[in-house]
């Protein structure tokens, strides 16, 4: 910028006077002593410039020339005529190159608006310094803005110097007068700068062969502000006297200059101090900081604090609010009402609280008294709110927020209740998401059920959609929902008459479920029944395709009669019209062109296609197939009929007529026994005259019999029968002689008639009485989980319910000729179990040993239905490794009904454990096992069997039993030898835990299939190959209270020792009652087959103590962990007992710890454990990695124990039964044997939960207990069943007598054979 030199004060007064005198005239521009716009002076010379003007004036000099320079001198004086003008002379001695620039003379003020000045540009010519400013080493920064003018100030010291502009490294910028303009007074001028000029520029010139250059670096300015933020939150809470520090941080682009300022309440009083700094270490942006600090805040400092940032046209601000409190406090209020509601399935739900506190308190949320965040990983505490992720039904409860300032002893808490509403769920939909359409027999009574759960309890509505036929080409006959629907009520006659709609509610698995039962009185119309369950959060719908059929099974071939050659063959193929279409016949190759198939007859419920073949011959025998297409699946379905044409045969006498002598008034009968094809026509003759049927003469069916009532003398004569058909005729004769008189009294006839009438009435009454006695009673717990709360047993019989379960003959039917029945394995009330060899099980070409359940001879129809019901239930349950699985059945006519299940050759677990009492070892002894394995060549070691079982994966659990090792006949013969070898092996703690774990897995599966066992005990656990145990007798549909075959069939009793209290007193059976029984089963296992409650009299006192919480002591071989599991299973409150899934996990952990302590993994169970649970096997490399949370298969075994070397003391709050001391004549009840059947249902009716204080004896006669503990507890060893060896007993043959009953210890010591040694009862509890 040019500098101004003010004039001296000597002439100041005169100047103002003169200015006043000339104010009225126009001033002239000051005049310089040099002419032109530029003037050249050689370097080192003196520059003289004189300015003459009409006013006092001043000089403006180049920026590099200082006014204080000693080389500069300005002289001011009056000049002109009479001194009326002002002159000043500027003298600059020893001029230099940087003195080059603009020199101007101007008036300091002007009476007119327009300024007046005279300018001359002076060049100081210096050949050694051609540029006024030299920047050779460090370039000068030039700020540029794209699109605006930019000056590159490479000014020269002489007007005629040629300058070249270059952009380093190689580009030369040539002035073109437009984009680049050269000005020797200013340098290079660029009117509109672009990105082209960004970079390092150089001005170059050459003088006297020497090259000179000066460099400039262009700098593009921006106004980009990336981010602005404060170090404090939007709301800052402080206590009086606290310090406040707010840091305002700005991120801006490179080449951006920012200006940061603060506005705050104490700004006027300068309450705060501000410090600023810049951080250019960031490669992406410059970071600017402005920090406002107030040492001790007061009330005046509360308010809004704002940080303002400006860069060119860009303006931004960020603010925060500061609140100053006088003291610390907590205020807590609800934002909403006390009862909050959420919907299950919601992704997130917030429990809000209105909190005002200082300072911020510690926040704790409790759910039902326990820390919420620890209780569930889905709970998150954010600020003062609790956020529940993926809301579930179990999230309902009481939530308490606790705010505390422990340092100052301040706290507040508030509780709200969360209700989780659940959309209606229909459990039948869960069982079958896409149910196949059901066929219902015409005029039959049908029951439809809908089991619903929801919160609040849903309203259930039944709708009816009549069928309409969709006449499209591809789905003709398909029954689809119509637009019109009808609301159904009891007594509705729309479509089908509704007999009743009943709703029942029950608590199942802790949920209050409602079941609605729709009873269709008579199936007449096809359509869709829709069960709609709705509440305020949603609705669910279940559609049941109700297709009425007059054809058995919906697709059937009927044959009018067995054809004879020469007759017509008529076959009718009928199919339900809503299920099938495109019916056609497939004929044997031998059938010729005389075949005639009529056009399909479309009836109300079905389509019938009749096939007629006239004048058939033997060649027409064969298989006739009717083909139809299933409308729903699109698959072709075939129905076959084997037709055998019978050849014609001439009549032949099977027996000749015999001469008879008949008394008068008696009756005579002649029978013409002939055979022929076709059936011969029989004609009777007397004395060669044809006999016609008339009063007193009766011709039997087909005229085969001739019956003469009250024979007379004239009936005597020669009787002849002639049998004739197309092939010929045959005859036979006999003479009937009549003797005696006709003098008889009519009293004989009257007496005979009355006797017949009386006998008929007596027989009718006897028949009705017997049928009433055999009428089945039905329980309140049915075969299906859904039926358990649905049907009134008196209203819908069990067999009718189970008729709804399907039986797929193509999958399960096995020809009887493929079975070779063997020895008997057991028997029940009306059935028996036999061993059999089966060929072709699951299409295998080899033989397999199986167990076959069948009825005894003389079984009734109801018993047949019961076994058929069991078959259907077993199919419904499915397959699992640890249950006795169904393999097939024989149901077709022509033989007995047989249910084929897996054969477990080692018998039941109870007998097996008893046989191993003398061979129990806590750990495995490899040397002992090796010795036993050497005794028989070719026997696979136990470890080898486990390795073989490792190939069994859980993927087969629903398709097979887990064992695909079908045996040949030679293998079957070695079963007993293999069983004997198993009895030689010692029993270990690992085996006991393994049995417990497997039973828990099997029960977990059964409970998942909604199956309740109700008689879970060691006698109902069978031992199979590879130490695999299987649960049996779980699929029997029978009510133990109402069925007379079970309750009072001889001395059969209820399994009281294994029953839960709620089952004993209230007859409640569910999964949790099975858990109780499982705890008793654990006691049996770890007592090595002992009878539960040893030495305890099973009477009312026992039941009362059981209700009060008295439990069994720990068995001898149980560890603390095992006994704790038993106590958990025996909790009085069923809801507090663990689920079977929890028991599987706990026992799986114990089993894994047990086997790993021996340095190996349990291969069979580990395989199953890995496939189903997702845990890695212990041999998996993943186990070698460091997991933050240990896997059950990778955990340490340091805490594992095998044997209870000391007496386990139960918790003090658990009372245990004390064993009764043995007295000389102590007699125990006979019903404490291992069969476990005690107390008939009539006696159970006397018990209630409140109990009776009066003690009375349940049994009048007492017998000897066959259990170790009850009969021999005082004289036997703790581990051995016998105090003597079997050899010693055989020599001494000692017998111990109690009362009148003798217990042979020889039998007690003898190991049972590898067979089913217990009775298999069919009359078991239902699921």
Curated annotation (Swiss-Prot):
Signal peptide region: 1-24
Sequence positions bearing Phosphotyrosine: 1046, 1162, 1202, 1231, 1316, 1322
Residue ranges annotated for the Ig-like C2-type domain, each copy included: 30-121, 120-222, 227-323, 331-417, 424-545, 552-644, 651-737
Annotated positions binding ATP: 825-833, 853
Active-site residue list: 1015
Enzyme class: transferase
Known catalytic reactions: L-tyrosyl-[protein] + ATP = O-phospho-L-tyrosyl-[protein] + ADP + H(+)
Annotated CDD domains: Ig
Transmembrane segments: 750-770
Ranges in the topological domain labelled Cytoplasmic: 771-1327
One of the record's GO cellular component terms: endosome
Record-listed E.C. numbers: 2.7.10.1
Extracellular topological domain residue ranges: 25-749
Biological processes, Gene Ontology terms: cell differentiation; cell migration; chemotaxis; positive regulation of cell migration; positive regulation of cell population proliferation; positive regulation of MAPK cascade; sprouting angiogenesis; vascular endothelial growth factor receptor signaling pathway
Function according to Swiss-Prot or TrEMBL: Tyrosine-protein kinase that acts as a cell-surface receptor for VEGFA, VEGFB and PGF, and plays an essential role in the regulation of angiogenesis, cell survival, cell migration, macrophage function, and chemotaxis. Acts as a positive regulator of postnatal retinal hyaloid vessel regression. Has very high affinity for VEGFA and relatively low protein kinase activity; may function as a negative regulator of VEGFA signaling by limiting the amount of free VEGFA and preventing its binding to KDR. Ligand binding leads to the activation of several signaling cascades.
Positions glycosylated per UniProt: 48, 73, 82, 98, 125, 247, 319, 383, 398, 409, 413, 470, 512, 543, 593, 615, 663
Protein name per Swiss-Prot or TrEMBL: Vascular endothelial growth factor receptor 1
Source species: Gallus gallus (Chicken)
């Amino acid at each position: 910028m040019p500098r101004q030199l003010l004039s001296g004060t000597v002439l100041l007064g005169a100047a103002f006077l003169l200015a006043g005198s000339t104010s009225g005239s126009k001033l002239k521009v000051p005049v310089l002593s040099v002419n032109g716009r530029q003037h050249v002076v050689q370097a080192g010379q003196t520059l003289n410039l004189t300015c003459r003007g009409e006013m006092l004036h001043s000089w403006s000099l180049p920026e590099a020339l200082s006014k204080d320079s000693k080389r500069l001198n300005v002289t001011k004086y009056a000049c002109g005529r009479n001194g009326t003008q002002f002159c000043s002379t500027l003298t600059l001695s020893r001029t230099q190159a940087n003195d080059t620039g603009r020199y101007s003379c101007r008036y300091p003020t002007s009476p007119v608006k327009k300024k007046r000045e005279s300018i001359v540009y002076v060049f100081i010519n210096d050949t050694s310094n051609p540029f006024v400013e030299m920047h050779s080493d460090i370039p000068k920064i030039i700020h540029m803005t794209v699109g605006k003018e930019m000056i590159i100030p490479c000014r020269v010291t002489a007007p005629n110097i040629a300058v070249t502009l270059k952009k380093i490294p190689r580009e030369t910028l040539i002035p073109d007068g437009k984009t680049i303009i050269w000005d020797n007074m200013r340098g290079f001028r660029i009117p509109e700068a672009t990105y082209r000029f960004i970079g390092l520029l150089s001005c170059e010139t050459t003088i006297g062969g020497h090259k000179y250059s000066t460099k400039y670096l262009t700098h593009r300015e921006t106004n980009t502000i990336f981010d602005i933020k404060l170090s404090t939150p939007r709301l800052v809470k402080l206590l009086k006297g606290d310090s406040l520090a707010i840091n305002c941080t700005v991120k801006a682009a490179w080449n951006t200059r920012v200006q940061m300022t603060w506005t705050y309440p104490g700004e006027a009083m300068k309450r705060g101090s501000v410090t600023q700094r810049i951080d250019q270490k960031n490669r992406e942006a410059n970071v600017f900081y402005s920090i406002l600090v107030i040492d001790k805040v007061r009330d005046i400092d509360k308010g809004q604090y704002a940080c303002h940032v400006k860069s060119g046209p860009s303006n931004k601000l960020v603010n925060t609010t500061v609140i100053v409190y006088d003291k610390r406090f907590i205020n807590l209020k609800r934002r909403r009402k006390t009862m909050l509601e959420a919907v299950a399935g919601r992704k997130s739900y917030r429990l809000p609280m209105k909190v005002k506190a200082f300072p911020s308190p510690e926040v704790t949320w409790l759910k039902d008294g326990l820390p919420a965040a620890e209780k569930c990983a889905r709970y998150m505490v954010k600020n003062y709110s609790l956020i529940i992720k993926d809301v579930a039904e179990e999230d309902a409860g009481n939530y308490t927020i606790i705010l505390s300032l422990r340092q100052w002893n301040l706290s507040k808490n508030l509780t709200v209740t969360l209700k989780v509403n659940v959309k209606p769920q229909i459990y039948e939909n869960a069982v079958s998401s896409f149910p196949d359409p059901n066929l219902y027999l015409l005029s039959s009574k049908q029951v439809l059920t809908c089991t619903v759960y929801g919160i609040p309890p849903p309203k259930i509505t039944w709708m009816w959609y009549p069928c309409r036929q969709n006449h499209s080409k591809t789905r003709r006959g398909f029954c689809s929902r119509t637009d019109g629907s009808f609301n159904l009520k009891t007594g509705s006659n729309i479509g089908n008459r509704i007999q009743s709609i009943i709703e029942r509610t029950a608590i199942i698995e802790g949920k209050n479920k409602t079941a609605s039962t729709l009873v269709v009185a008579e199936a007449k119309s096809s359509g869709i029944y829709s069960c709609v369950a709705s509440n305020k959060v949603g609705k669910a719908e279940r559609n049941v395709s109700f297709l009425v059929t007059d054809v058995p099974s919906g697709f059937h071939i009927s044959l009018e009669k067995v054809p004879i050659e020469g007759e017509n063959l008529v076959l009718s193929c009928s199919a339900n019209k809503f299920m099938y279409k495109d019916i056609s016949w497939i004929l044997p190759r031998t059938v010729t062109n005389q075949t005639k198939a009529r056009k399909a007859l479309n009836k109300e419920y079905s389509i019938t296609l009749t096939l007629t073949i006239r004048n058939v011959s033997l060649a027409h025998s064969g298989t006739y197939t009717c083909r139809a297409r299933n409308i729903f699946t699109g698959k072709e379905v075939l129905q076959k009929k084997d037709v055998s044409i019978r050849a014609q045969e001439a009549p032949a006498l099977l027996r000749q007529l015999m001469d008879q002598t008949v008394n008068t008034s008696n009756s005579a009968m002649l029978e013409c026994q002939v055979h022929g094809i076709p059936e011969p026509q029989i004609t009777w003759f007397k004395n060669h005259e044809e006999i016609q049927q008339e009063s007193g003469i009766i011709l039997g069916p087909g005229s085969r019999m001739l019956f003469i009532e009250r024979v007379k003398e004239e009936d005597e004569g020669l009787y002849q029968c002639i049998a004739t058909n197309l092939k010929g005729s045959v005859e036979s004769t006999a003479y009937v002689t009549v003797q005696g008189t006709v003098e008889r009294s009519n009293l004989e006839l009257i007496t005979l008639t009355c006797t017949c009438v009386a006998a008929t009435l007596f027989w009718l009454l006897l028949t009705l009485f017997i049928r009433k006695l055999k009428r089945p009673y039905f329980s309140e717990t049915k075969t299906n989980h859904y039926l358990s709360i649905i049907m009134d047993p008196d209203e819908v019989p069990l067999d009718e319910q189970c008729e709804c379960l399907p039986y797929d003959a193509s999958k399960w039917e096995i020809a009887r000729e493929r079975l070779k029945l063997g020895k008997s394995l057991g028997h029940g009330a009306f059935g028996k179990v036999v061993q059999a060899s089966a060929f072709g099980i699951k299409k295998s070409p080899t033989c397999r040993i199986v167990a076959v359940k069948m009825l005894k001879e003389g079984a009734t129809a109801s018993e047949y239905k019961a076994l058929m019901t069991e078959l259907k239930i077993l199919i419904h349950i499915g397959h699992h490794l640890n249950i006795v699985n169904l393999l097939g059945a024989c149901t077709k006519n022509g033989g007995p009904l047989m249910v084929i299940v897996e054969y477990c050759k080692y018998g039941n677990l109870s007998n097996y454990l008893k046989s191993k009492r003398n061979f129990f070892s806590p750990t495995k002894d490899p040397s002992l096992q090796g010795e036993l394995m050497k005794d028989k060549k070719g026997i696979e070691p136990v470890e080898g069997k486990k390795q073989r079982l490792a190939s069994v994966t859980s993927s087969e659990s629903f398709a097979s039993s887990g064992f695909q090792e079908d045996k040949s006949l030679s293998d079957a013969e070695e079963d007993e030898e293999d069983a004997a070898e198993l009895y030689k092996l010692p029993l270990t703690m690992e085996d006991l835990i393994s049995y417990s774990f497997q039973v828990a897995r099997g029960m977990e599966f059964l409970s998942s299939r909604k199956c309740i066992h109700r008689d879970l005990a060691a006698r109902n656990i069978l031992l199979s190959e590879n130490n695999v145990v299987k649960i049996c007798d779980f699929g029997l549909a029978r009510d133990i209270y109402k069925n007379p075959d079970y309750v009072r069939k001889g001395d059969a009793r209820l399994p009281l020792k294994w029953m839960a209290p709620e089952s004993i007193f209230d007859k409640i059976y569910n999964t949790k009652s099975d858990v109780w029984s499982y705890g008793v089963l654990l006691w049996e296992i770890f007592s090595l087959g002992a009878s539960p409650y040893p030495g305890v009299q099973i009477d009312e006192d026992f039941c009362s103590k059981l209700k009060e919480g008295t439990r069994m002591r720990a068995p001898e071989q149980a560890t603390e962990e095992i006994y704790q599991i038993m106590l958990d299973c025996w909790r009085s409150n069923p809801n507090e007992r663990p689920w079977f899934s929890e028991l599987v996990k706990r026992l799986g952990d114990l089993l894994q710890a047990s086997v790993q302590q021996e340095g190996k993994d349990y291969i069979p169970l580990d395989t199953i454990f890995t496939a189903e649970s997702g845990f890695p096997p212990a041999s998996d490399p993943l186990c070698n990695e460091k997991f933050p949370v240990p896997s059950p298969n990778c955990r340490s075994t340091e805490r594992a124990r095998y044997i209870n070397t000391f007496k386990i003391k139960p918790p003090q709050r658990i009372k245990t039964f004390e064993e009764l001391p043995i007295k000389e004549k102590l007699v125990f009840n006979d019903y404490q044997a291992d069969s476990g059947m005690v107390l008939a249902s009539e006696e159970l009716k006397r018990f209630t939960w409140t109990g009776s204080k009066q003690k009375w004896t349940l049994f009048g006669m007492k017998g000897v207990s066959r259990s170790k503990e009850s009969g021999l507890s005082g004289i036997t060893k703790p581990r051995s069943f016998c105090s003597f060896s079997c050899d010693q007993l055989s020599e001494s043959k000692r017998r111990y007598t109690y009362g009148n009953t003798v217990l042979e210890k020889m039998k007690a010591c003898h190991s049972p054979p590898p067979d089913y040694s217990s009775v298999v009862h069919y009359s078991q509890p239902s699921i």
